[in-house]
Amino acid sequence: MIFGSILLAFGSAAIATILGTTGAVGAFYSKKRVRNTLSVLNQVPVVNADVVTGFSICILIVVVFGVSKDTYIPLAAGHVVLSAPFVYLAVVPKLKQMDPSLYEAALDLGATPAYALFKVIIPQIASGILSGFVMAVTLSLDDYFVATYTKPATFDTISTYVVNATKGSQTQIKTALWALSTIIFIIVIVVEL
């Protein structure tokens, strides 16, 4: 369960980081109308309730596209859809801080657009990409609703396991979760000092 959740978090975060970064760079270098449209479309998963996102992903992938829910495809797609807008939102401010003349200078000096992208733009926005990746991992580990609607029946993420364990009368698990919560709370307080 823990290994599967971590693998899901890092895998979906990697895909979300690629999609979010690509979308942010593409929107940044697009015309204003396209940029504004992409920005508005990016906000839909952010302001939408996770329950609606999870249910919609389940309906779209399982019912419309006919992908079996026993695979991990709906779960991974749900986590990517949930996380990619946050990566986009982390990368866009770094693009606005960047000096656009450096990219143009690289092109004037004979660099191909792809070479200039990887050698000029990506290093300047690397901190935004990294923060977006960390946010995507955190969202994936924390998510309950999207995982509930899209996960296979035989798989539990950490969040679904914890919520399901606290619903029943499993007092040993509840006690262990309370102890774990106390330890995490103390660690957070110590780190903040």
Give residue ranges: language-model regions.
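Hydrophobic alpha-helical transmembrane segments of multipass integral membrane proteins
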Residues: 3, 7-19, 23, 49, ...
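Transmembrane-helix boundary motif in ABC transporter permease subunits
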Residues: 10-42, 59-63, 117, 193
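Membrane-interfacial helix termini and adjacent extracytoplasmic/periplasmic loops
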Residues: 34-36, 51-82, 114, 150-154
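C-terminal transmembrane helix and the adjacent membrane-cytosol boundary/short C-terminal tail
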Residues: 92-103, 107, 113-120, 175-193
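Alpha-helical transmembrane segments of multi-pass integral membrane proteins
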Residues: 8-16, 24-27, 42, 46, ...
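Hydrophobic alpha-helical elements at and bordering transmembrane segments
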Residues: 1-2, 6, 27, 38-44, ...
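Transmembrane alpha-helices
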Residues: 88-91, 98-100, 113-142
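Interhelical loop and adjacent transmembrane-helix boundary motif
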Residues: 1, 141-193
